[in-house]
Amino acid sequence: MARVKRGVTSHARHKKVLELAKGYRGRSSTNYRIALERVEKALRYAYRDRRNKKRDFRALWIQRINAAVREHGLTYSRFINGLDKAGIEIDRKVLAAIAFDDSAAFGEIVKKAQAALG
């Protein structure tokens, strides 16, 4: 068996980690051991927050819809119930955009939801 020296692979691995740690403060960007910990933690945060981002945006859309619906004298939950009964299938992202950009069109949607509630 030939002797295997690992200098090239470890150098490449270190280089990859230090490249990811570029811009970090202090030794976190220059010392491999510390950089590895920082990079691993950053990747964990990134993974977690890609999922949290979906929750956060949904909550934002609901808040915007709720604020717009209350101007028309209705609550968010009754509005969503009215949309369901009226057979209007618009997702919260689009509803929030309509409420934010085109209040007249949103008012028409609210009227249809109110009519479906009875």
UniProtKB/Swiss-Prot annotation:
Q: Which InterPro entries match?
A: Ribosomal_bL20, RIBOSOMAL_L20_CS, Ribosomal_protein_bL20_C
Output a single Gene Ontology CC term carried by this record. ribosome
Query: What GO terms are given for molecular function?
Result: rRNA binding; structural constituent of ribosome
Superkingdom in the source lineage: Bacteria
Would the keyword Transport turn up in this protein's UniProt record? no
Task: Name the Gene Ontology biological process terms.
Answer: ribosomal large subunit assembly; translation
What are the UniProt keywords, alphabetically? Ribonucleoprotein, Ribosomal protein, RNA-binding, rRNA-binding
The UniProt family comment states: Belongs to the bacterial ribosomal protein bL20 family.
> What is known about what this protein does?
Binds directly to 23S ribosomal RNA and is necessary for the in vitro assembly process of the 50S ribosomal subunit. It is not involved in the protein synthesizing functions of that subunit.
Q: Check the record and name the NCBIfam families matching this protein.
A: rplT_bact
Which named protein is this? Large ribosomal subunit protein bL20
